[in-house]
From Swiss-Prot:
Function: Methylates caffeoyl-CoA to feruloyl-CoA and 5-hydroxyferuloyl-CoA to sinapoyl-CoA. Plays a role in the synthesis of feruloylated polysaccharides. Involved in the reinforcement of the plant cell wall. Also involved in the responding to wounding or pathogen challenge by the increased formation of cell wall-bound ferulic acid polymers.
Organism annotation: Eucalyptus globulus
Record protein name field: Caffeoyl-CoA O-methyltransferase 1
Gene3D superfamilies per UniProt: Vaccinia Virus protein VP39
GO terms (BP aspect): lignin biosynthetic process; methylation
Positions that bind S-adenosyl-L-methionine: T63, E85, G87, V88, S93, D111, A140, D164
Oxidoreductase recorded as keyword: no
InterPro entries: Cation-dep_OMT, SAM-dependent_MTases_sf, SAM_O-MeTrfase
Family, per entry: Belongs to the class I-like SAM-binding methyltransferase superfamily. Cation-dependent O-methyltransferase family. CCoAMT subfamily.
One of the record's GO molecular function terms: caffeoyl-CoA O-methyltransferase activity
Length: 246
């Protein structure tokens, strides 16, 4: 039988690997949050899409339910209308956003895999918010460059990024121009399941260690960027909110 210390080490190790969306060191506490605050108030379309996504072999890529709830409320609080999402997967966070926007709200959504998006599209359509979404398949950087060339600077109220971590800084260089002064950019996975503080010899998977270096670089750059105010939150896998101030 494992000792209390061994069980603690096992749980700590699990939280250093991508595969557990909560950064809380207690699974029971996270379950309490979901069962008392998140699931009872989760819109039916989001519940349906979450359950569909859970069957996907890469379901860990989805936004967690508590983070979806957070994004939905945040968008309402800032009265967002024109938004952008880089990295869609099956569309759980996209649906959370679409449900929060007014009837004339818009989301420019980008992902390299349309097939995953189409898995959730029937739910989005049934929820009556598909007309708010302009989905574009392919790499985001060329689209962002075109937006800047077309003079769309300062036209977005909120931008959510949950995509390739090795391009986060490249995204930021462009998004800081596209978000309005007073608008928000949200970068997901900025605590990378706790691996950002794992010791150098921690037994991390190769891709976890690889992307961790980019996440650490991003966190350092955001903290030093005078054009934004930042707030890093331990929601989901860590989300850093950046409010453009200049």
């Amino acid at each position: 039988m494992a000792t209390a210390g061994e069980e603690s080490q096992t749980q700590a190790g699990r939280h250093q690997e991508v595969g557990h969306k909560s950064l809380l060191q207690s699974d029971a506490l996270y379950q309490h949050i979901l069962e008392t605050s998140v699931y009872p108030r989760e819109p039916e379309p989001m519940k349906e899409l979450r359950e569909i996504t859970a069957k996907h072999p890469w379901n860990i890529m989805t936004t967690s339910a508590d983070e979806g709830q957070f994004l939905n409320m945040l968008l309402k609080l800032i009265n967002a209308k024109n938004t952008m999402e880089i990295g869609v997967f099956t569309g759980y966070s996209l649906l959370a956003t679409a449900l929060a926007l007014p009837d004339d709200g818009k989301i420019l959504a980008m992902d390299i895999n349309r097939e995953n998006y189409e898995l959730g599209l029937p739910v989005i359509q049934k929820a009556g918010v598909a007309d708010k979404i302009d989905f574009r398949e392919g790499p985001a950087l060329p689209i962002l460059d075109q937006l800047i060339e077309d003079g769309k600077q300062g036209s977005f109220d909120f931008i959510f990024v949950d995509a390739d971590k090795d391009n986060y800084l490249n995204y930021h260089k462009r998004l800081i121009e596209l978000v309005k002064v007073g608008g928000l950019i949200g970068y997901d996975n900025t605590l990378w399941n706790g691996s950002v503080v794992a010791p150098p010899d921690a037994p991390l998977r190769k891709y976890v260690r690889y992307y961790r270096d980019f996440v650490l670089e991003l966190n350092k750059a955001l903290a030093a960027d005078p054009r934004i105010e930042i707030c890093m939150l331990p929601v989901g896998d860590g989300i850093t909110l950046c409010r453009r101030i200049s």
